[in-house]
Amino acid sequence: MRLYVVSGSYHPEVGGPSTYLRRLLPELIERGHHVSVITYTDAKNSGIDDGFPYPVYRVSRSWPLILRLVLFTINILWRARDYDVLFVSDYGLPVILANLILRKPIVLKNVSDFAWEYSVRHNWINKRQTIDEFQISRHGWRVRVLQKLRAWYTKKASLIIVPSKYIGKLVSGWGVSPDHVRVVYNALDYSRFDNLPSKADARKTLGYSEKLPIVLTAARLVSWKGVDSVIRTIAKIRDDFPRIHLMVAGDGPERRQLEKLAVESELPVQFLGFRSQENLYNIMRAADVFVLFSTYEGMPHSVLVAMACGTPVVASSIGGTVEVITDQVNGLLVPAGNEKALADAIRQLLNQDSLAQKLSTGAVHTLQRFSWDSLIEKTENSLLEVIN
């Protein structure tokens, strides 16, 4: 199979698509497939990136948006003409336009709702509107155009890969037949967790005492991740745990507002910014509780990482999260936005070592469902399916 991969970002840039493709593509090559990639770069000039054992072409982001999209589309049209299938990871429109001429089978990996995320980022809708509310609410003309565009290019794909049943239902709501949707869960490379330090050693390396209550949240700092609620919640339970320490890993447009909220709450919050995977694993290992209090998750990769690190998880019962966590078995689920329930759950885990241990043990069994072998097998089968 000759596979042409289209992605908005690629290694060494950070982010989900980059990490996913960096691991997936060598595995597909190992299985005898030929791979080529087109993506973007922050460098001034476009061109071939020689740093990979397969062709990677980068289009510069320095061009104005419309011209950038035109160049990206033209390059797909020119470079993908001899390939069997187009595999789109997070960047659908240019490849669909190019394919009006190429007429190739397309597999689209869809992990969210582009129209919703774009509308939130550009303040076209209330930033507190959830992804589910967005699907059924009345919107202005700009949002409606974006929704129609998203539905159009999604329906043009031969097959859509989604990371959870929840996202599958979301996509079906745009007019896509469920027969064209394949659920392929995210995965972890468990070998990366084989040599993790003990909790005590991780804390020693990071400079924290063994008795310090540490709560960690790791997420892109955008409104739907609920980090503001986590800060307020930790401030409320500080009377019970005077030395409690909150760490926030990740960065994003909400960071300045969150830092201001931490100061107003008189809470010592440590904003860590982006961290390497290995460093984040050590931080996860040192934490007593990992919290993900989002109002939306397609498939929470950070929850899988926390589980692999042996850190008990508290998460909001939404989206793909409920496909990973079973309440009181491998984590604690709380209603989205309910800060009182979140506070109670964190208190439980900080006060009950036996519960924390029970959840960590339950998580070990859960992780078996999220293996790379399974992801690669199902992804390869989906790609071959559209050819055959």
What are these regions (language model features)?
Residues P312-A315, I325:
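Short hydrophobic beta-strand element within catalytic cores of glycosyltransferases
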Residues T295:
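Aromatic "clamp/platform" in nucleotide-sugar-dependent glycosyltransferases that forms part
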Residues Y166, A187:
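Carbohydrate-associated surface elements
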Residues D327-Q328, L332-E339, Q348-D353:
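Conserved acidic donor-binding segment of nucleotide-sugar-dependent glycosyltransferases
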Residues E259-R275:
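Nucleotide-activated donor-binding/catalytic signature segment of Leloir-type glycosyltransferases, i.e.
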Residues V6, S209-K225, I231-I234:
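Conserved donor-binding/catalytic core segment of Leloir-type glycosyltransferases
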Residues I74-L77, R81, T130-I160:
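Membrane-proximal helix-turn-helix segments that form the acceptor-binding/catalytic region
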Residues T154, F274-R275, N282-A287:
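Short alpha-helical donor nucleotide-sugar binding micro-motif in glycosyltransferases
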